[in-house]
């Protein structure tokens, strides 16, 4: 009886670990998001060549977040990070109307990869503080998210510099990855 209770207790209260891959076009705000979540503050960033990886502790979950550079020359390297990814965060600059089609193409190219077939998708519609930013509904449309019938996805409006929307996104990820486990 005691052993059964111990197993149940540890299953309920043990820290869960989740591997998250965060990608998106260059200058979308990925690194700013990563360090806002990790440190709770805004850090000065430079374009990411390669990757940053940090562990973010939130609600008894340890998120290992891989932030991979988004410049067009290094996007082919994204595929090297796909294996064992449980959640995919795709960050979009909501103010960048000129490149939203490029963002859509990169997203759909990635989602066609077999190694990501089981990963849930969270889209961060970032930079919502800017006056010309597209709202989440417009980005949903422009990214063609409704066509993703076989994929569990969610879009969250965010502002990396204030932190608005970031933890709501982590809540969705934790609930939806946990339900698939």
Curated annotation (Swiss-Prot):
SMART domains named in the record: ARF, RAB, SAR
Sites of N-myristoyl glycine lipidation: 2
Cross-referenced Pfam families: Arf
Species for this entry: Oryza sativa subsp. japonica (Rice)
SUPFAM superfamilies: P-loop containing nucleoside triphosphate hydrolases
NCBIfam families: small_GTP
Reactions performed catalytically: GTP + H2O = GDP + phosphate + H(+)
Protein name (database record): ADP-ribosylation factor 1
One GO CC term, this protein: Golgi apparatus
Cystine residue pairs: none
Superkingdom, taxonomy of origin: Eukaryota
Keywords associated with the record: ER-Golgi transport, Golgi apparatus, GTP-binding, Hydrolase, Lipoprotein, Myristate, Nucleotide-binding, Protein transport, Transport
EC numbers: 3.6.5.2
Any single GO BP term: intracellular protein transport
Family: Belongs to the small GTPase superfamily. Arf family.
Expression tissues: Seedling shoots.
Binding site for GTP: 24-31, 67-71, 126-129
PANTHER family, per database record: ADP RIBOSYLATION FACTOR-RELATED (PTHR11711)
Function, as annotated: GTP-binding protein involved in protein trafficking; may modulate vesicle budding and uncoating within the Golgi apparatus.
UniProt GO molecular function: GTP binding; GTPase activity
Compartments in which it is found: Golgi apparatus
